[in-house]
Amino acid sequence: MKKQLIIGTRSSPLALWQAEFTKAELSRHFPELDITLKLVKTTGDVLLDSPLSKIGDMGLFTKDIEKHLIAKEIDLAVHSLKDVPTSTPEGLIITSFTEREDTRDVIISKGGAKLADLPLNAKVATSSLRRMSQLKSLRPDFEICDIRGNLNTRFKKFDEGEFDAMMLAYAGVFRLNFSDRISEILPHEIMLPAVGQGALGIETRVDDEQTREIVRILNHSNTEYCCKAERALLRHLQGGCQIPIGAYASFKNGTLKLLAFVGSVDGTVGINNEITRSGLTSPDQAEEAGIALAEELLKQGADKILSEIRKTR
């Protein structure tokens, strides 16, 4: 058994929360372990003057940490799973999917107004094409404004009065104790989350069996089934932060239900579908369900939507 572990993480407040949470959970199970954090600045932390969708680079928040993992300078990397590309570098693997927080998105607004009550032509801040597409389909009048930076930075920009509202993931807002700022939690019926939203992905080297065995204690089986289904769907659609794709899977008593959405950036075209599979006994079967739903979306015309978006990116 190893005596020491080094966790690689970004230095944002939310990333540090996630790394400290992982450290505390591992220490609870393995009190003899000496666990330290190594902070890594990523491309996504540096390039803050462009929308994520325009940068055109997969793994903006992960690949720099993965370089340290491959070089054996750290033993594991802790990521927001929604930031992790669906294909990991050779020699690396997502070993654990931690139990998921609430996957929904939230509205933070002036005066606590709900989405339906925001004024005509309201300025709504989000850096996500997925949110933009679904928002514009609900309210074509909204002016969508790009916003980058960590959660604290976004709240500062919002409080300075630049926007009428902004959209964030509930999980991050809750984890950093901003829950009292939430105006509305949006149901999946109107806003499907990002693939993997609310879960942490703990990445290790494939050949580091000792670390993998230690980290596997944090894996949450239901979350693994759900996230592998969602990630398989996204992989099959060849999507990322440049494509408006939302998905949400639930898994109970061997039955997986997966909802998915593909839309145009302007919200004028959107395709929704779902799949239910029963009797699942392995995460591989959940991935098969994700691929099957992706195929259905492509048959419905998702390929045309995605092709048009890629022409402009």
UniProtKB/Swiss-Prot annotation:
Cofactor: dipyrromethane
PROSITE patterns: PORPHOBILINOGEN_DEAM
Pathway: Porphyrin-containing compound metabolism; protoporphyrin-IX biosynthesis; coproporphyrinogen-III from 5-aminolevulinate: step 2/4; Porphyrin-containing compound metabolism; chlorophyll biosynthesis
Any Gene Ontology biological process: chlorophyll biosynthetic process
This protein's UniProt keywords: Chlorophyll biosynthesis, Porphyrin biosynthesis, Transferase
Residues annotated as transmembrane: none
Top-rank taxon, per record: Bacteria
Gene Ontology cellular-component terms listed: cytoplasm
Record EC number: 2.5.1.61
Gene3D superfamilies: Periplasmic binding protein-like II, Porphobilinogen deaminase, C-terminal domain
CDD domains, per database record: PBP2_EcHMBS_like
S-(dipyrrolylmethanemethyl)cysteine: modified positions: 241
GO MF, one example: hydroxymethylbilane synthase activity
Cofactor binding notes: Binds 1 dipyrromethane group covalently.
Catalysis: reaction(s): 4 porphobilinogen + H2O = hydroxymethylbilane + 4 NH4(+)
SUPFAM superfamilies noted in UniProt: Periplasmic binding protein-like II (SSF53850), Porphobilinogen deaminase (hydroxymethylbilane synthase), C-terminal domain (SSF54782)
Stated family: Belongs to the HMBS family.
Purpose of the protein: Tetrapolymerization of the monopyrrole PBG into the hydroxymethylbilane pre-uroporphyrinogen in several discrete steps.
Subunit structure: Monomer.
Note: The porphobilinogen subunits are added to the dipyrromethane group.
Protein's name according to its UniProt entry: Porphobilinogen deaminase
